[in-house]
Design a protein with these regions (language model features):
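Structural microenvironment flanking redox-active thiols in thiol-disulfide oxidoreductases
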Residues: 9-51, 66-76
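Thiol/disulfide oxidoreductase modules built on the thioredoxin-like
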Residues: 3-6, 53, 63-116
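Active-site-proximal beta-strand/loop segments in catalytic clefts of secreted hydrolases
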Residues: 1-3, 33-36, 61-63
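Structural recognition of alpha->loop->beta junctions
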Residues: 51-57
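Conserved beta-strand scaffold positions in the cores of enzyme catalytic domains, especially
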Residues: 30, 58-59
């Protein structure tokens, strides 16, 4: 996600609400990577702080990090995971395999509900 993305600013609090109310106590872990585009690390810190997004792991991926990877011949996360838009939601299983990708918050909730019922 991108801390300057208007859509991300709408989606992340909704995602956090679903997570804290339904998924966290079910043992689901959530991990977010904020990718620097037009904003800064301070924009990211401010948004995470204002929205109190503390119940899950937040990581900041700077332009310098991305440049360093590319210059080292290592694809950036956007290339590795085909991230074209922000935010991009992926679901991984307990073995960290991607089981669903590019979901909305509602689709994520639906998939998790189906998975929970199948257990």
């Amino acid at each position: 996600w991108d801390p300057t993305c208007g859509h991300c600013k709408e989606v992340l609090p909704r995602l956090d609400s679903f997570y804290t109310k339904k998924w966290k106590d079910a043992g689901l872990k959530m991990f977010a990577i904020a990718k620097e585009t037009d904003g800064s690390r301070n924009d990211w810190i401010r948004f995470v702080t204002e929205q109190q997004l503390w119940s899950w792991t937040q990581v900041y991926y700077s332009k310098a990090d991305d440049k360093s990877r590319v210059e080292g011949g290592i694809p950036g996360y956007s290339q590795l995971y085909d991230v074209q838009t922000f935010p991009t939601i992926y679901l991984l299983d307990k073995d960290k395999r991607i089981i669903a990708k590019k979901l909305t918050v509602e689709q994520t909730d639906d998939v998790l509900n189906i998975k929970r019922k199948a257990q």
